[in-house]
A protein has these predicted regions:
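Conserved glycosyltransferase catalytic-site signature
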Residues: 50, 70-72
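Periplasmic-binding protein-like
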Residues: 134-138
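Beta-alpha-beta core module
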Residues: 2-12, 72-120
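A local structural motif
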Residues: 56-65, 99-100
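Secondary-structure junction motif
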Residues: 31, 36-60, 123-131
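Short helix-loop capping/hinge motifs at secondary-structure junctions, enriched
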Residues: 20-29, 107-109, 120-126
Length: 138
């Protein structure tokens, strides 16, 4: 497939939710506590493969799963339906606002953060800068 993955770091799994969510403010959240709330996932398109899923635990069966293809919809569903998503905990407040929290999920699983590029292709200066910013979260 001529693609290569480069790992940058591993991190804990976080639950990303609205500050008004009933579980907001906790030190940790368990899967059992999340069962009654909709899990939000980014839609990957018609040719989706779970190999390319952005979310950790993407193969689990959730009681409620809502897929969206844009950040604004995801954030509205977090507020309006007490939805959540699982993430790395790396949150850009400038994009999403300050009305959301990332709370550690009680699990031994780790997320692997990295990037995919075509073999033999050089990374641009801007790409290298972005990668260095990501490394800063390790």
């Amino acid at each position: 497939n001529d693609l290569e993955f480069t790992e940058l770091f591993q991190c804990d799994v976080y639950v990303y939710l609205s500050n008004h969510h009933p579980l907001a403010g906790r030190d940790k959240i368990t899967f059992e506590e999340l069962v009654d709330y909709p899990c939000l996932s980014f839609e990957q398109g018609d040719k989706n493969s779970f190999y390319f899923a952005e979310e950790v635990f993407s193969t689990l069966q959730y009681k409620q799963m809502i897929k969206a293809d844009d950040r604004a919809t995801m954030l509205n569903l977090m507020v309006g339906m007490n939805g959540y998503t699982l993430c790395s905990g790396i949150i850009c407040e400038e994009l999403n606002g300050d009305g959301y929290s990332a709370i550690p999920l009680e699990t031994d699983e780790k997320m692997t953060i990295g990037y995919i590029k075509r073999k033999g292709m050089h990374i641009s200066h801007i790409g290298k800068s972005y990668i260095e910013i990501l490394r800063g979260y390790a």
